[in-house]
Swiss-Prot record:
<dbReference type="GO" id="GO:0045454">
    <property type="term" value="P:cell redox homeostasis"/>
</dbReference>
<dbReference type="InterPro" id="IPR036188">
    <property type="entry name" value="FAD/NAD-bd_sf"/>
</dbReference>
<keyword id="KW-0676">Redox-active center</keyword>
<protein>
    <recommendedName>
        <fullName>Thioredoxin reductase</fullName>
        <ecNumber>1.8.1.9</ecNumber>
    </recommendedName>
</protein>
<dbReference type="GO" id="GO:0005737">
    <property type="term" value="C:cytoplasm"/>
</dbReference>
<dbReference type="InterPro" id="IPR008255">
    <property type="entry name" value="Pyr_nucl-diS_OxRdtase_2_AS"/>
</dbReference>
<keyword id="KW-0521">NADP</keyword>
<dbReference type="Pfam" id="PF07992">
    <property type="entry name" value="Pyr_redox_2"/>
</dbReference>
<dbReference type="GO" id="GO:0019430">
    <property type="term" value="P:removal of superoxide radicals"/>
</dbReference>
<feature type="disulfide bond" description="Redox-active">
    <location>
        <begin position="136"/>
        <end position="139"/>
    </location>
</feature>
<keyword id="KW-1015">Disulfide bond</keyword>
<dbReference type="InterPro" id="IPR023753">
    <property type="entry name" value="FAD/NAD-binding_dom"/>
</dbReference>
<comment type="subunit">
    <text>Homodimer.</text>
</comment>
<keyword id="KW-0560">Oxidoreductase</keyword>
<dbReference type="InterPro" id="IPR050097">
    <property type="entry name" value="Ferredoxin-NADP_redctase_2"/>
</dbReference>
<dbReference type="GO" id="GO:0004791">
    <property type="term" value="F:thioredoxin-disulfide reductase (NADPH) activity"/>
</dbReference>
<comment type="similarity">
    <text>Belongs to the class-II pyridine nucleotide-disulfide oxidoreductase family.</text>
</comment>
Length: 318
């Protein structure tokens, strides 16, 4: 373990919130240090197509957008550190953070650690993770070329995953516990076009009862009808779970005020909107937002957190 590194402002996370905070903080001469976390670029790097980022009307990829954000942050001399923070001590200043590679202290902290894919929680699902069960179609979809797969979920992510896989797999079985989908209309329209083409098969009013498999991996699913309770089996080679995300806040439990895992912020009308229950600690992006969860809103709160941190540090030095 190397010596402790001190930063005036430390930013945790390298998604839209973290990189935007870094850009604004660097331009304010705060000399931010950004710790990337395990997944550099965050969730967005697993998104194949983005068509609602202002200015990129021709459509862009998540990984491409995050690479440009990284370059933007580096242009203003943000120091990027490839490490993962596994423990923090926010009880006194400077704040202490303990990484896999290095330890840090800082005068102000912006938490932009994002969220991770949520799984259903079945033992059989856990047993086949990495052997047919995944939460990322763009990461693992190519393994299932011309093979049948399933997708579980009813929101934008599930429909996007199904549409992406429809261009790879032989058949995509989209499974949803309700009788209608919550996705945006443009995605629903594309979904039903693929249904008409026979590329996607809908299984509504169904829940996952069991992941079936053998020593080689997933071989199928057992579904339960939510109205009748009847069970049915599907033969397929892969399952993609798209039922939402959980905020990455485990290391902050007992140190910050949380609400269902999300960091509570002040959201004040007089500024300081991203301030947490600990003075000098700010939160941005999916780690504090359970309603909107968009790349653009994450970036916006990253900007707000940088401005809040700048005001806080200025007041400390006054």
């Amino acid at each position: 373990m190397s010596d402790i590194k001190h930063a005036k402002l430390l930013i945790l996370g390298s998604g839209p919130a973290g990189y935007t905070a870094a850009i604004y903080a660097a331009r304010a001469n705060l000399k931010p240090v950004l710790v990337t976390g395990l997944q550099q670029g965050g969730q967005l790097t697993t998104t194949d197509e983005i068509e609602n980022w202002p200015g990129d009307f021709e459509m862009t990829t998540g990984s491409g957008l995050m690479q440009r954000m990284l370059q933007h942050a580096e242009k203003f001399e943000t120091e990027i550190v490839f490490d993962h923070i596994n423990r923090v001590d926010l009880s006194s200043r400077p704040f202490k953070l303990f990484g896999d590679v290095q330890n840090f202290t800082c005068d102000a902290l912006i938490i932009a650690t994002g969220a991770s894919a949520r799984y259903i929680g079945l033992p059989s699902e856990e047993n086949y993770k990495g052997r047919g069960v995944s939460a990322c179609a763009t990461c693992d979809g190519f393994f299932y070329r011309n093979k049948p797969v399933g997708v579980i979920g009813g929101g934008n992510t599930a429909v996007e995953e199904a549409l992406y896989l429809a261009n790879i797999a032989s058949t995509v079985h989209l499974i949803h516990r309700r009788d209608s989908f919550r996705a945006e209309k443009i995605l629903i329209d594309r979904l039903y076009k693929k249904v008409e083409e026979g590329k996607i098969v809908l299984h509504t009013d169904r829940t996952l009862d069991e992941v079936l498999g053998d020593n080689m991996g997933v071989t199928g699913l057992r579904l339960a009808n939510t109205k009748t309770g009847e069970k049915e089996e599907l033969k397929l080679d892969g399952l993609f779970v798209a039922i939402g995300h959980s905020p990455n806040t485990e290391i902050f439990q007992g140190q910050l005020e949380l609400n269902n895992g999300y960091i509570v912020v002040k959201s004040g009308l007089d500024g300081n909107a991203t301030a947490t229950s600990v003075e000098g600690v700010f939160a941005a992006g999916d780690v504090m937002d359970h309603n909107y969860r968009q790349a653009i809103t994450s970036a916006g709160t990253g900007c707000m957190a940088a401005l809040d941190a700048e005001r806080y540090l200025d007041a400390q030095e006054a």
